[in-house]
Design a protein with these regions (language model features):
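Single-stranded nucleic acid-binding surfaces, predominantly the OB-fold ssDNA-binding core
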Residues: 1-105
Length: 105
């Protein structure tokens, strides 16, 4: 039986990754993504730790689709809303423009 918080699926990148150093040595990368669904698309926050976040920032752009694996969590906000956060463990490219990615490197 699998873990109930484990997520794998296709997401669309909505913005540029934002990197931040935590505790003066741990790099985190956050990016808003969209989960394509039949009824209504959902936006969630995707978080990467360490070198994986650097790879996401360097290789992927806005509107690229990636397949991710990771764990989901729910963060409570002040507005009585719940924010879904996915901590990404693995990333696989699906639809992205390799030529423009190589030009930016």
């Amino acid at each position: 039986m699998g873990d109930t918080n484990y997520f794998s699926g296709t997401v669309k990148l909505l913005g540029n990754p934002i990197q931040k150093v935590v505790r003066q040595k741990i790099l985190t990368t956050k990016i808003w993504v969209e989960l394509p669904q039949y009824r209504q698309n959902r936006c969630v926050l995707l978080v990467f730790w360490g070198n994986l976040g650097d790879e996401v920032k360097n290789f992927y752009q806005i509107n690229d689709y990636i397949f991710i694996e990771g764990y989901t969590s729910i963060k409570k906000t002040n507005l009585k809303l719940n924010k879904i956060v996915i901590t990404g463990l693995k990333v696989y490219p699906i639809l992205f423009d390799l030529k423009s990615t190589l030009k930016n490197s």
